[in-house]
Regions:
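Membrane/wall-proximal cationic-aromatic binding patches
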Residues: 1-68, 171, 175-176
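Loop/turn elements at helix/coil->beta-strand transitions in domains of secreted/extracellular proteins
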Residues: 38-39, 70-73, 99-103
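Oxyanion-hole/transition-state-stabilizing segment in secreted/luminal serine hydrolases
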Residues: 42-44, 54-60, 88, 92-129
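Structural preference for long, well-ordered alpha-helical segments in enzyme cores
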Residues: 44, 64, 90-91, 143, ...
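Short, solvent-exposed loop/turn segments at secondary-structure junctions
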Residues: 48-49, 80-82, 108-112
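A conserved hydrophobic secondary-structure block that centers on an alpha-helix together
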Residues: 65, 69-89, 93-96
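Serine-dependent acyl-ester chemistry module
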Residues: 109-176
Length: 176
């Protein structure tokens, strides 16, 4: 469970974003990357990898394909709002099976803080009621918590925000 991801075979309401049959950013709705014989490279990360706010032909993945030339396809696994933790989980869940020759991780400073969040709605700029997986280090081992994630109905069925599980791991929550 990734918290949220790009749904397969969809287009945004304004038509700017489209996704492939596999849930990757693509030029056309529902196109498939399965069975392509080209050399594959994979792009993981946040809205910069996804190339939010720009059409496909201006996306990072498209420009990488142009720079690398014929015979190379970039699989765009980027998802807006992801931290490096979710990008790693997406690689494990969706990307590894493609056996890309190269995997590229994009990140910005804020992505490093996102690894310490469980709930997105504590970030003032978000306001979106989602939860995400969270890694913690225990006895020298990475342990994945909140997987599967808590759904919005589960979150808002609580009598108080203080009743949410894993609240002690939420760095954006500052009760007064």
């Amino acid at each position: 469970d990734l918290g949220w991801t790009v749904a397969p075979g969809r287009a945004s309401a304004n038509g700017l974003y489209k996704s492939s049959a596999e849930g990757l950013r693509s030029r056309e709705v529902g196109e498939t990357y399965a069975g392509i014989a080209d050399t594959l490279a994979a792009l993981f990360g946040n809205s910069f990898a996804f190339s939010e706010e720009v059409p496909f032909d201006d996306s990072l993945a498209h420009h990488l394909e142009l720079d690398l030339g014929a015979g190379t396809r970039i699989l765009n696994f980027g998802v807006p709002g992801y931290g490096v933790d979710q990008a790693l989980l997406r690689f494990r869940k969706d990307g590894r099976s493609w056996a890309p020759r190269v995997a590229v991780l994009t990140f910005i400073q804020d992505d490093l803080f996102r690894v310490a969040n469980v709930y997105t709605f504590f970030k003032v700029a978000w306001g979106i009621p989602l939860s995400k997986p969270r890694f913690v280090l225990r006895d020298g081992e990475l342990l994945l918590l909140n997987s599967p994630t808590i759904s919005p109905p589960e979150m808002f069925s609580r009598a108080s925000v203080f009743d949410l599980p894993l609240l002690d791991l939420e760095i954006e929550f500052f009760p007064h």
